């Protein structure tokens, strides 16, 4: 069931179905994007995403490997998934879902880039160059 929610998340973004996409989140959910400044409430994330959802496709991520764990209580799940994206290549999604009266809802989603260790020093140096 948790996997179906995540599949639906990606499918509704790909079809730009804004109403269903945002209904998959809890009202107090957080979306954490790839930039260090991207820690959004749902209201902030929706405002950011609105222009994307006015297109035929908001964005497309395809899950190719996913691990889901459910707490012994049965009402909290966490996951990580490897995603493919045409612009970014391989990315990673991770997060937390909670079981609500309306089914599983995403409480937190984190989108990140997996940085190969072989280039990590170079990536960190470039990030630091952008700091004031």
Which residues are covered by each model-predicted region?
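Short beta-strand edge/turn micro-motifs at domain boundaries
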Residues: 90-122
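Short, hydrophobic secondary-structure boundary micro-motifs
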Residues: 22-23, 32-33, 61-62, 107
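Short, low-complexity N-terminal intrinsically disordered segments enriched in polar/charged residues
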Residues: 1-27, 43, 75, 118-132
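Short active-site-proximal "capping" loops at secondary-structure junctions
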Residues: 28-30, 36-39
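Surface-exposed, charged secondary-structure patches
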Residues: 1, 30-31, 43-90
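Residue-level detector of flexible, active-site-proximal loop/helix-junction positions
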Residues: 36-38, 68, 113
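A short acidic, helix-capping loop that chelates divalent metal ions and anchors anionic groups
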Residues: 31-33, 117-118
């Amino acid at each position: 069931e948790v996997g179906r929610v995540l599949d639906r998340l990606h499918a509704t973004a790909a079809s730009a179905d804004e109403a269903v996409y945002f209904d998959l989140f809890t009202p107090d959910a957080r979306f954490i994007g790839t930039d260090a400044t991207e820690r959004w409430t749902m209201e902030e994330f929706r405002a950011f995403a609105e222009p994307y959802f006015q297109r035929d496709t908001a964005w497309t991520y395809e899950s190719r490997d996913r691990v889901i764990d459910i707490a012994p209580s049965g009402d909290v799940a966490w996951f990580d998934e490897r995603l493919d994206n045409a612009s970014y290549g391989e990315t990673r999604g991770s997060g937390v879902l909670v079981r609500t009266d309306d089914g599983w809802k995403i409480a937190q989603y984190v989108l990140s880039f997996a940085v190969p260790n072989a280039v990590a020093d170079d990536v960190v140096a470039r990030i630091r160059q952008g700091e004031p």
